[in-house]
Regions:
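Acidic, proline/glycine-rich low-complexity IDRs
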Residues: 117, 121-148
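Vicinal oxygen chelate
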Residues: 2-10, 41-42, 63-93, 118-120
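Short, flexible active-site-adjacent loop segments at beta-strand->alpha-helix junctions, enriched
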Residues: 56, 90, 110, 124, ...
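Amphipathic N-proximal alpha-helical interface segments
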Residues: 53-67, 127-135
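Core segments of cupin and vicinal oxygen chelate
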Residues: 7-58, 97-112, 122, 144-147
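Short acidic, gly/pro-rich beta-turn/loop elements at beta-sheet edges
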Residues: 15-17, 60-62, 94-96, 130, ...
């Protein structure tokens, strides 16, 4: 179970707001880690959350008995391998409408012919795979490959 994960964005408040909308949740400032950070909270009863930091933010270990610290790298790459699949109660057309409103690329894909996702490219650089209720069922019903 993943309770939260973090991504970086040029406009953290905007990106957190869109993720919250996909979840029918809410977005709020989240300053504990980095200045200008926001969080999208799902209305799922489990406090699922996506933390959205300023572009270039890097979490680094702190010395001694201290929390990880956030440092901004001005040379941050535009694209990364980091992505997540998130569930939404919205219909496909609603997800596409949100992406279109924001000016972000979105398209339906069938992963390996097994389950569908809507690729939503936040700020046209960070991938989230959005699964509607039908797609969630396809994903949950996957049979794991046989073990060794």
């Amino acid at each position: 179970m993943i309770h939260h994960y973090s991504i970086a964005a040029r406009e953290p408040a905007r990106v957190a707001g869109v993720i919250a909308e996909l979840w029918r949740g809410r977005a709020m400032p989240f300053p504990p880690v980095g200045e200008g950070s926001w969080a999208a909270l799902a209305a799922d009863g489990r406090n699922s959350m996506v933390e959205v930091y300023a572009l270039g933010s890097e979490l680094r270990p702190a010395e001694g008995d201290a929390d990880a610290r956030c440092v901004v790298n001005p040379q941050a790459p535009r694209f990364t391998a980091t992505h997540a699949a998130i569930a939404t109660p919205l219909a496909q057309d609603e997800v596409f409408a949100i992406a279109a409103r924001e000016g972000w690329e979105a398209k339906y894909r069938k992963r390996g012919g097994l389950f569908g996702v809507i690729e939503v490219w936040l700020e046209n650089s960070t991938l989230i795979e959005v699964l509607t209720e039908e797609m969630q069922q396809e994903y949950v019903n996957l049979k794991p490959p046989p073990g060794p």
